[in-house]
């Protein structure tokens, strides 16, 4: 019986060129987050299922349809993380980080898992960058997290390919009034709604606004607007966020139906979308989640239960589809000892060059012509030959593979020559 060699459906191998693009996106995001005062953090990709049961919302698509859930050998229910925020908040509570100096600002990246229909920009194993600011309830914190997202997209040369949509879900009082209005409105169309939306009508009508069903969308287009149900405090908060964005020159569109797909959001929610990646239009999204800490059982030393927080995540695969970045190949130096007698001389030079941060490989097998062919195949910039003459004269014969020119360089001038003449 033959072994199945293809990756599991919805996963893929990241070969060097695509890996380089992913690595570039993560590096840009990490470096910019550091300028904003964020620190790196990493959590396990596997968590107890309860972490997500308590945070994502029982009627969310993620929890009801997309989670990878299984029993471990101790008969404990565990899940592959479908997103980062709940795991980060668990780490904060477990490690008592909430009682350190606030705010906490964390950058993380890595794989997440959702059992979904694979298509362009959407895999069952996918990769994200994730940023969380925990412990700051100011409107500027909301604006700053959007500004960081904008700076990442700008550095990736994607600002002209995306649009920022923003909304506010208001405070709990605002949401309660709005949800009642939605129940009254959608109840008139109960039989016309999709089965998923019918099941959400009573417990979480906000989620109907997030439905991907085309008929649901048509009904939602005339639904009441949450903007008519804000408390004065919620309205002032959102107005201040928008004021900061305008001051920073960030263009946005208010989308009254934007609610995001998870239940822990409140106040500001936002998405950067693009029309250039097919059905998966959202490339980056996030919002405020002030109630998540309390929902997960967290407590502050002061006795308070609420820990404000805001963050966002971006899909690396989707960013990679949009960016035109091409990883720059580092062209190595190839050392070719002309015979076995000089292998050790070649290995000594190999170590010397690597210790000086020069990418170098050594080729010890086959004829000189075959080794030159391999050097050309890996796009080496130069070949260094070592033989009896070179050892005797304490020199190296160097061939430039772009021009085919050769030169002889004495030992103590080799480093400066390579540093000045290699791309």
UniProtKB/Swiss-Prot annotation:
Q: What is its main location?
A: cytoplasm
For this protein, the record's InterPro entries field holds: aa-tRNA-synth_II (IPR006195), aa-tRNA-synth_II/BPL/LPL (IPR045864), Anticodon-bd (IPR004154), Anticodon-bd_dom_sf (IPR036621), His-tRNA-ligase (IPR015807), HisRS-like_core (IPR041715), HisRS/HisZ (IPR004516)
Q: Name one GO biological process term.
A: histidyl-tRNA aminoacylation
Places the protein is found: Cytoplasm
Q: Tell me one GO molecular function of this protein.
A: histidine-tRNA ligase activity
The UniProt record lists the EC number as 6.1.1.21
One Gene Ontology cellular component annotation held by this UniProt entry: cytoplasm
Q: The organism sits in which domain of life?
A: Bacteria
Reaction equations catalysed:
tRNA(His) + L-histidine + ATP = L-histidyl-tRNA(His) + AMP + diphosphate + H(+)
List the keywords (alphabetical). Aminoacyl-tRNA synthetase, ATP-binding, Cytoplasm, Ligase, Nucleotide-binding, Protein biosynthesis
Q: Which Pfam families match?
A: HGTP_anticodon, tRNA-synt_His
Q: Note the subunit structure.
A: Homodimer.
Recorded family membership: Belongs to the class-II aminoacyl-tRNA synthetase family.
**Protein name, entry field:** Histidine--tRNA ligase
